[in-house]
Amino acid sequence: MLFRNCAGGVVFYEDKILILKNEKDEWVLPKGVIRNGSLSRDVALNRVKEETGVDAEIISSVGETCYEFFSLTRQKPVCNEITWYLMKAPEEKYELNTELGFKEVGFFHLDEALEKITYNQDRSLVSLSHKKYKELMNTLIRA
């Protein structure tokens, strides 16, 4: 089995979340493999920018997820362990990167995003992240 460390972002603009539709018609969160000793924070920020055109800022860590799949190109099982960061976008502006195989991107209200997101694990992560985001934003407003 091939083990890969990855990093990604759960990006909010106000009360909306950023998700993408990939080449397999799956609605996912932006993420990528950590290579050459890069920091997970940097990889997460770079993948968000590269995949969606959004210049987000990290406001907190969210946790980790892990999933396994069989890679047809590698002909072996792969385990991706992903470190997730809660991020805030400066504006509701994005840019679809079709060169990476993405078909759609956008900021969606929580209910719509949860309906669209393909994987249960990602839906749980988004729900948890939304709660944490609201708590952090309320703390900042009161400060």
Give the predicted meaning of each segment.
Residues V10, I19, W84-L86, F107:
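Conserved hydrophobic/aromatic beta-strand scaffold that supports enzyme active sites
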Residues G53-K93:
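Active-site segment of metal-dependent pyrophosphate-handling enzymes
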Residues E14-K16, K88-K93, L110-E112:
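Short loop segments at secondary-structure junctions
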Residues W84, E95-S127:
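NUDIX/MutT-family hydrolases
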Residues M1-L29:
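N-terminal strand-loop-strand
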Residues L29-E64:
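The catalytic Nudix box helix
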Residues V28, C79, F107:
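Short aromatic/basic micro-patch
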